[in-house]
Amino acid sequence: MIKLNIDGSEIEVSEGSTVYQACTQAGKEIPHFCYHERLKIAGNCRMCLVEMEKSPKPIASCAMPVSNGMVIHTDTPMVKKAREGVMEFLLINHPLDCPICDQGGECDLQDQAFRYGKGTNRFHENKRSIKDKYMGPLIKTAMTRCIQCTRCIRFANDIAGIEEMGAIHRGEHMEVTSYLEQTLDSEMSGNMIDICPVGALNSKPYAFKARKWELKHTASIGVHDAEGSNIRIDSRGDEVMRILPRVNEEINEEWLSDKNRFSYDGLKYQRLDLPYIRKNGKLVEASWSEALKTIADKIKSVKPEKIAAIAGSLVSVEAMFMLKTLLQKLGSNNYSVNQFDYKFDTTQRGNYLFNTTIAGVEKADLCLLIGANLRQIAPVLNSRIGQRVRAGSLKVARIGEGHNQTYRIQDLGSDIKIIEELAIGTHEFTKALKAAKYPMIIVGDGVYARDDGYAILSLIHKIVAEYNIMRDDFQGFNMLHNHASIVGGLDIGFNTPIKLEELELTYLLGADELPFDKLKSAFIIYQGHHGDSGAANADVILPAAAYTEQSGIYVNLEGRPQIAEKAVAPVGVAKEDIEIIKELAGSLKIDIGMDNLQEVRVRLAKEYKIFANIDKIVESKFAKFSFKDKLSKEPITMGPINYYMTDVISKNSVTMAKCVEAKEKRNERAA
């Protein structure tokens, strides 16, 4: 520990800390622009100047390491004058257009100019003006406002892992740019908007829509992937205006993927706001009572074993649990969250979880990806791994034909024989597995989406056992899920095998990705919020609330249950999922023993201990899985993935459609 004096108080800080960090620990407010605790130090802005005894001039506290016996002053006349001077220089070329700037009201420059500036301007010459840059459909630029803090450049290099931002020219003529002025290639580019301390980088979809003080803030969870990123929904009235990240050190830190951030406009289009019944081959509007009576009459006429429920990728645990309870009361045990027919082993909970945990990857020293496209399936997790790789603390290898990653990776090939050789110890890479202290394996849909997925998974379990990858001090076996509802559904047993061709009645709870040709003879009920393929094939449509319009629990890929709170009201006469299921049970004269959300959660917590520990990870058991089957000769591939359109909300997002178009144009230029 290092001892130093700050404004007359003795404090101790860790060796390697900066003066800025020491001052912050001592409770001192130090203004800054370029410094960010998650980025490398740049020392560009000089706003963090403090006085150090025996130094003839102020020092940049963000770049100065602490040493024993230092005496620091943060509020002397010298410091005040230095900060006033720095602020005056920063404002020389700034346009001072706060009334029309989207950053107004939440701008670091605005706040610090008011707190530390002089209040008068001595500069009367012409200001510098810079042409705005094109960075794609997500980021709107106003580069005349840029103060060259280089946060965006450092984020692109250090966090996103794609070196596509930089500075050109020098001095007053310096410009921050994306070089070729084309769409940014990162799936996390929106975070540059958050870390920009001025209004140089703004959200293009949110431009000129609202001011911060007009918005209601609601804590929620990102549902467009299985990471469980913590988000804040900003709404005005019943409209979602924007989505921002919330800090959660164990999951997303303070970052957010572009799909979770920008796809919210999909909530406005193709919404189901009325019940519908198919009559004479056409869907016609109906009342709630008429729709529920039609369903109840049909259910009574069908044998229980011919009834099944299938949940989609955006469904909450409470909705699945309530529907499961209803089906069991009817005498049916056919229900599944697995609309893609993924090959999951549910022998033990640890067999289908990301056991290392998202934060735990920082302990690993070797990572083997098998059929896993981390960059597009889990961008935030991919960023964590990339930072470790660039720091030289982690080596990553891959089995499977895949997409470009944002870090150096050893490509082992895509042949199934590689996994077989690893299982028996004859492959060259086994040396690395044996030498690693904390090896981890990540299994993606390139494995569990295959017909021979169980057989491959059995081989992977042999590798796990052979190299002691699952042990008390480090659990290195991980399943990489790609949908928000899957882990929660598996946790409550909403995963029984279903033969679609034999069904006479199918209840689709937000499920749109089924092979509907296998359901031609079935009566289809669709409960959901968007008019997609599920609604198009339905005989009865029940309009439901989206994730922003109801409260629900989602379990992320590491097994952590989290609550997404209700931000706005449902559209039209749409209702919340559990309310619809409760009313349907009433129409069937069935008592499912749960009348509201609180009662559902109490029952969940009693039956499954993980739901008594919200926001926490409960220790899960792991068991070796063995399955004998013929292996396909097909190579392991991740397949083409349209990152921006993976569910009914993102598919109906105009912003996501623009991203797809912009990415295609970028790829054409690259070709």
UniProtKB/Swiss-Prot annotation:
It catalyses: a quinone + NADH + 5 H(+)(in) = a quinol + NAD(+) + 4 H(+)(out). Binds 1 [2Fe-2S] cluster per subunit. Keywords: 2Fe-2S, 4Fe-4S, Iron, Iron-sulfur, Metal-binding, NAD, Quinone, Translocase. It is an enzyme of class 7 (translocase). InterPro entries: 2Fe-2S_ferredoxin-like_sf, 2Fe-2S_ferredoxin-type, Mopterin_OxRdtase, Mopterin_OxRdtase_4Fe-4S_dom, NADH_UbQ_OxRdtase_75kDa_su_CS, NADH_UbQ_OxRdtase_ferredoxin, NADH_UbQ_OxRdtase_Gsu, NADH_UbQ_OxRdtase_Gsu_4Fe4S-bd. Its EC number is 7.1.1.-. [4Fe-4S] cluster 1 binds at residues 94, 98, 101, 107. The keyword Signal does not apply. GO terms for biological process: ATP synthesis coupled electron transport. Residues 1-78 form the 2Fe-2S ferredoxin-type domain. GO terms for cellular component: membrane. NDH-1 shuttles electrons from NADH, via FMN and iron-sulfur (Fe-S) centers, to quinones in the respiratory chain. Couples the redox reaction to proton translocation (for every two electrons transferred, four hydrogen ions are translocated across the cytoplasmic membrane), and thus conserves the redox energy in a proton gradient. PANTHER family: NADH-UBIQUINONE OXIDOREDUCTASE 75 KDA SUBUNIT, MITOCHONDRIAL (PTHR43105:SF13), RESPIRATORY NITRATE REDUCTASE (PTHR43105). This is NADH-quinone oxidoreductase subunit G. It comes from Rickettsia felis (strain ATCC VR-1525 / URRWXCal2) (Rickettsia azadi). The lineage of its organism: Bacteria, Pseudomonadati, Pseudomonadota, Alphaproteobacteria, Rickettsiales.
